[in-house]
Amino acid sequence: MTGSRETEWLDVHRGDAPLLLCFPHSGTTIPDALEADFVSPWLARKDADWWIDRLYAFARDLGATTVRTDISRSVIDCNRDPSGASLYPGQATTDLCPTGSFDGEPLYRGPTPDEAEIARRRARYFEPYHAAIASE
């Protein structure tokens, strides 16, 4: 099942096996309204987990449920703690709405997302993604 118009970036395939696979970083879509904010289209997409959803496509044939976002992790990283707590203490990580790449390159041409923009992206993308996981 692909999401509604409001969640067309969210793909949920419901299987019948007790296995759930989530792909929070396979997306490369940047909403049109945000594209020009980034230094370059490539830089905003390069930290994706390229083709990971295809690598695990066989799991659907085994009955697995899969949840995938098509939104680039540079827009919002659905695998980050919204509180800012590091998932990997001592290692390079990015924020919920990253402002730089893992190589330390700035992602934005100008101002970075403020609290209101982060809250908007969280409500628009992060929360529906996690609600889809929780419903499984």
Can you say where each PLM-predicted feature lies in the sequence?
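N-terminal catalytic or cofactor-binding beta/alpha core of small enzyme domains
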Residues: M1-E136
